Amino acid sequence: MFVGGDIIEIKYNHPILGSGTLYCKAGEDGTMDRGGFRTADDANAVTGAGEMIVQLNRSLASFETPPIAWDMTDKDELEKINKLAGHPLNADWTITSVNGSIYGGKGRPVGEITGNTNTAQITLKLAFEGEIKKIS
């Protein structure tokens, strides 16, 4: 059986900024790229004799989260995420799914970090060193 579903929580632990938990909006998609090496998709990667030329390049591991719930009056997740993105050290992250699987790695928020004041949601993409590992 194949079981997907909601991300229950995203936890971070930063050596200077401390730890915290982010909660995602239910029923929304998240996209994970576990990273590692990829073979380039190039129609011209072939010799004159027809032998394939294999080009392997490392791909950055990343997770585009479902929208993060934003408590503007108390927890202010947007401020915390911005501080994590702007600090020179990476944090340890874990991503827990409703199906019981937990993934994690060392990384940081990247790209645009915007909060929607109407829906109380934050867009978030995390990038990781090496590969995203399955913890359980």
What is each model feature region?
Residues 1-69, 99-117, 123:
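Solvent-exposed edge beta-strands and adjacent loop segments
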Residues 121-136:
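C-terminal or internal capping secondary-structure element at the end of a domain, subdomain, or sheet
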Residues 72-76, 134-136:
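Short, cysteine-centered beta-strand-loop-beta hairpins and adjacent loop/turn segments enriched
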Residues 67-72, 128:
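Short beta-strand-to-loop capping motifs
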Residues 75-103:
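Short, acidic/charged, Gly/Pro-enriched secondary-structure junctions
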Residues 86-92, 114-119, 127-128:
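Short, surface-exposed linear patches
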